[in-house]
From Swiss-Prot:
GO terms for molecular function: DNA binding; methyltransferase activity. A gamma subtype methylase that recognizes the double-stranded sequence 5'-TTCGAA-3', and methylates it on an unknown base to protect it against the NspV endonuclease. Keywords: DNA-binding, Methyltransferase, Restriction system, S-adenosyl-L-methionine, Transferase. Belongs to the methyltransferase superfamily. This is Type II methyltransferase M.NspV. Signal peptide: none annotated. InterPro entries: N4_N6_ade-DNA_methylase, SAM-dependent_MTases_sf. It comes from the Bacteria. The keyword 4Fe-4S does not apply. GO terms for biological process: DNA restriction-modification system; methylation. Its EC number is 2.1.1.-.
């Protein structure tokens, strides 16, 4: 059981900003010409940001600090700086209950919203039965499978930042927040998708190990707002001190990591690819569906010896194997119960009775899989399967690893190789075509192209949408 204090810190994504870092952030903002009349910190914690801001922004007439943790508020009120200065307005409040429009909307002067919002996702909240969440709604507007297979998991700070951006749309002001770098891009995506006002934005990488003792890719995210500008790009700085940067922005409504590099290679870009990268099989029950072969004996993830027909068993190459080039042999196998999504599975009972008995033995695990993709589907269904899964030749890459290395993979033991759902692949019937294609994909030109698109700090940096954006026909004409 998580101790109550620890649970509270986890629930609120509680990473208190050291005064040293708060001062550096404020100094940077001053260098950039930020000089607000009003300062707001929505989750002020121990008050380090509002303290640093009071020293740096001497013109500020009012500094608001809102905090849900009453223990922190008690400590703030003990600090001498906050005792006798009427410009400070420190309140107890829950971000998700505060009417930010009424607070910010009343202010007709230049505003700075500054701080450090919680670094926690809604799924992490669920794992500890946390309640520090906004009212549930699909604010990212994900559709279909994206909404039900986990893409709708989001950082709490993402929702909070969107709310603050909305409040600043009718103001001249700034937003300066510490957040995960991936969250800053999601906010830029939101602003772009909604065609909101944005005069300028930038991120400055921060040393989270030094300041927070965690290994998280995070940044100072700065946005400048006015009443007319719609500048949907973001300058990326390696740290707060440097003046060197590169610019991310949009091409064909897709966020691009390096606009300059893509401009040089834009003839290779397509949003109507003739080929389609697929992901491997998803089953959400590895302990039953994946087996290890040891001395001609199959063992499942529960440690059980499994005696079944090999009719529905196929060699499995996991994403880590693809990344490490362990592709010519495997001791892992996967039960593939369907050839296409939604195919009836009853025929397994007749074609492979021992396999059916095995599945029924573990029906409780299989029937209680949480994902909605299995609802109202045949028993023991899988996902991410089709005729492409059984092609003899495949070109594969793991979406989780931070390297662009494509592997050509053939059959193993006369059976087509199957991948897990961390792998993306192209399928081929013809070995020669597959061989030529993998050579194209591993060319320096292809790597330069993909490198201009991939954000390596993301959990799954390589995505099918990125892979599909390379026009292989054009690339072949350039190289061959």
């Amino acid at each position: 059981m998580i101790h109550n204090v620890e649970k509270t810190k986890l629930e609120y994504g509680d990473f208190q900003t050291p005064l040293e870092l708060a001062e550096k952030v404020c100094e940077k903002l001053v260098q950039l010409g930020v000089n607000p009349d009003i300062i707001v910190e929505p989750t002020c914690g121990l008050g380090n940001f509002i303290e640093a801001a009071s020293y740096s922004f001497t013109r500020a007439k009012k500094i608001f600090g809102i905090e849900i943790n009453s223990n922190y508020l008690d400590k703030i009120k003990e600090k001498q700086i906050f005792l006798n200065d009427e410009k400070f307005d420190i309140r107890c409040g829950d971000f998700f209950q505060v009417d930010w429009s009424s607070i910010i909307g009343q202010l007709n002067k230049e505003i700075l919203i500054i701080g450090n919002l919680p670094w926690v996702t809604n799924s992490q909240q669920g794992s500890i039965d946390g309640e520090n969440l906004p009212i549930k709604n699909n604010f990212q507007n994900y559709h279909g499978l994206d909404a039900i297979t986990g893409k709708s998991n989001f950082d709490i700070s993402e929702w909070m930042l969107i709310r603050l951006v909305q409040c600043l749309q009718k103001h001249n002001g700034y937003l300066a927040m510490l957040c995960k770098t991936s969250v800053s891009r999601k906010i830029l995506n939101y602003i772009h998708s909604q065609k909101l006002n944005l005069a300028y934005s930038a991120t400055y990488k921060i040393d989270t190990r030094k300041y927070f003792r965690v290994n998280v890719d995070a940044c100072l995210f700065l946005c400048k707002f006015d009443l007319i500008s719609k500048n949907y790009f973001c300058d990326i700085f390696d740290n707060i001190e440097t003046s060197k940067y590169y610019r991310i922005g949009y091409h064909n409504n897709v966020l691009i990591k390096d606009l300059v590099a893509l401009k040089r290679l834009k003839n290779l870009y397509t949003n109507k690819s003739n080929i389609k990268w697929r992901s491997g099989i998803k089953h959400d029950c590895a302990s039953v569906m994946e087996l290890q072969k040891i001395n001609d004996t199959f063992i499942n993830g529960l440690g059980e010896i499994v005696d079944i027909e090999e009719t529905y068993l196929f060699p499995l190459i996991k994403g880590s194997y693809v990344a490490q080039n362990k592709i010519n042999a495997t001791d892992r196998y996967i039960l593939v119960t369907q050839k296409i999504i939604g195919e009836p599975t009853d025929n397994i009972r007749d074609l492979a009775p021992k396999t059916w008995q095995y599945l029924e033995k573990h029906e409780k695990l299989l029937d209680t899989r949480k994902s909605k993709i299995y609802q109202n589907k045949p028993r023991f269904s899988i996902f991410g399967v089709g005729s492409y899964s059984f092609s003899p030749w495949k070109i594969a890459i793991c979406g989780l690893y931070k390297k662009l290395e494509f592997r050509l993979i053939g059959k193993i033991s006369e059976k087509p190789t199957i991948f897990d759902d961390t792998v993306y692949f192209l399928s081929f019937e013809d070995e020669e075509i597959a061989f030529k294609t993998v050579a194209l994909l591993n060319s320096s030109l292809a790597r330069d192209f993909y490198s201009s698109l991939v954000f390596w700090d993301e959990k799954r940096p390589i995505k099918s949408s990125i892979l599909n954006s390379l026009d292989l026909e054009v690339l072949a004409k350039v190289i061959l």
